[in-house]
Structure formats: C-alpha cells, structure tokens
C-alpha cells in the first residue's frame, strides 16, 4: 500500500508540474519567444517535424526563425518517468496537442512531447526541458 501512495504522490507532482509548465511554455512561445530557451537544459534536444536542434544557441537561432504564433492547447497528459529509466533523476513526460497558427496563417493541428527534469536547489525546484518533439498533425489530402 505504501508503494501505491508514493506513486500517487509522484503522479500528482507530475500533473502539477505539467499544468504549470504548459501554461508557461506556450505563453512564452507566443509572447516572449526570446526567453524560451530559459526553459531548456543546456544540452536539450528539440525535434521539430523531423529536424533536430541541440543546445541553447541553436535553439535560440531556431526559435528566432519561426514566425509569430498563436497556440491553443486542447489536450494535456503527463506521467512521471520511472526513476530506473532516468538514473534517479525526477523526470516527467508531458504530452500536448492542439492547434497553432503561424503569422496568422492557416490553422495546423500539432502534437508535442516534452521530457522535463527537476532541477533542485536549496530554495526551490525548477523544471527544465531535456527533450522536446513537435509535429504537425495535419491530414494529408488524397
């Protein structure tokens, strides 16, 4: 029973972290994009529709090239990642989907997955992105 209570605590922590993170991430993406790299670890990797971007400088350059955006998140799911898979690093998997318009153009459906790791200091815990995978989910016309 103690294991179930402990796991529920991890799940609750993951959900709180994911909800806070998603609000911050997409607001920053839409309104303060130059600050977005602060949410990433130094050696984080982004895969954007199959294109790999690694490291803060490359991420900053990539985000600067994107047109202005309007994200709407319609779905959020999260779960803690088992500590055996992450060398005891507190990690949360966050999955989102929704719609985005770039430069006010046509709306696209998207799916985005994040691996967040807890960066703990004496005063608080900050969640940083270790891995980020973004994909458009538009239907192909046949």
Swiss-Prot record:
State its location(s).
Nucleus; Cytoplasm
Name of the protein this chain belongs to: NTF2-related export protein 2
Segments forming domain NTF2: 17-136
Primary location:
nucleus
How does the annotation summarize its subunit structure? Associates with NXF1, NXF2, NXF3 and NXF5.
Function, as annotated, reads: Regulator of protein export for NES-containing proteins. Also plays a role in mRNA nuclear export.
Entry's Gene Ontology cellular component terms: cytoplasm; nuclear pore central transport channel; nucleus; perinuclear region of cytoplasm
Per UniProt, which keywords does this protein have? Cytoplasm, mRNA transport, Nucleus, Protein transport, Transport
> Entry's CDD domains?
NTF2
GO BP annotations of the record are: poly(A)+ mRNA export from nucleus; protein transport
Q: Which organism is it from?
A: Bos taurus (Bovine)
Q: Which domain of life is it from?
A: Eukaryota
SUPFAM superfamilies, alphabetized: NTF2-like
Q: Which InterPro entries match?
A: NTF2 (IPR045875), NTF2-like_dom_sf (IPR032710), NTF2_dom (IPR002075), Nuclear_transport_factor_2_euk (IPR018222)
Taxonomy, top ranks, is: Eukaryota, Metazoa, Chordata, Craniata, Vertebrata
Q: Does the keyword ATP-binding apply?
A: no
């Amino acid at each position: 029973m103690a294991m179930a209570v402990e796991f529920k605590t991890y799940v609750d922590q993951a959900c709180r972290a994911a909800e806070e993170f998603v609000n911050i991430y997409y607001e920053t993406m839409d309104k303060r994009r130059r600050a977005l790299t602060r949410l990433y670890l130094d050696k984080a990797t982004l895969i954007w529709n199959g294109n790999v971007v690694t490291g803060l400088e490359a991420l900053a350059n990539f985000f600067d090239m994107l047109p202005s955006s309007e994200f709407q998140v319609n779905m959020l799911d999260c779960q803690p990642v088992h500590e055996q898979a992450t060398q005891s690093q507190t990690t949360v998997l966050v999955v989102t989907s929704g719609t985005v318009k770039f430069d006010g153009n046509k709306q696209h459906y998207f799916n985005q997955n994040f691996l967040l790791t807890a960066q703990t200091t004496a005063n608080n815990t900050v969640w940083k992105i270790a891995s980020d995978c973004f994909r458009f989910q538009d239907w192909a016309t046949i």
